[in-house]
């Protein structure tokens, strides 16, 4: 059975890249661009993994992770933080908020898929070529 993954990312290019990679590996993917809608979407979908940008408008990814971890329905869902801003101390701050993995952009495809499967388990179908 395919793993369910929800992506919270405001950048359309990154969103499509992550979605296409995950779907090509057999995952069932939902996407959210607005962090203000994320908690409701996560509750409705109950994914095995949430992949989240940290630099989001309106609500930061760090704050959104904290909100998830404070919610008894969502606190056990692993979170993989993805960010272009990988400064000193950022990983510690993100992990302290409750992220289970931290990947900096630009992503390495193999590192990304390995991190996803490390948190969610095998995605459910192996690599599927488009066509």
Question: Which residues does each PLM region occupy?
Answer:
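Acidic catalytic/metal-coordinating carboxylates
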Residues: 13, 34-37, 60-66
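Active-site beta3 strand of CheY-like receiver
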Residues: 45-51, 56
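C-terminal output helix
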Residues: 13, 107-116
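The feature encodes the CheY-like receiver
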Residues: 57, 75, 87
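Conserved acidic carboxylate
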Residues: 9
């Amino acid at each position: 059975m395919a793993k369910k993954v929800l992506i919270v990312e405001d950048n359309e290019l990154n969103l499509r890249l992550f979605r296409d990679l995950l779907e090509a590996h057999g995952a069932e993917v939902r996407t959210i661009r607005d962090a203000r809608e994320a908690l409701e979407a996560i509750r409705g979908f109950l994914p095995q993994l949430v992949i989240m940008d940290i630099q989001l408008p309106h609500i930061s990814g760090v704050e959104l992770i904290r909100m998830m971890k404070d919610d008894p329905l969502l606190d056990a869902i692993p979170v993989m933080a993805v960010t272009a801003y990988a400064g000193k101390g950022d990983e510690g701050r993100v992990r302290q908020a409750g992220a289970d993995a931290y990947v900096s952009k630009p992503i390495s495809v193999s590192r990304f898929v390995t991190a996803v499967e490390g948190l969610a388990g095998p995605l459910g179908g192996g690599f599927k070529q488009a066509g």
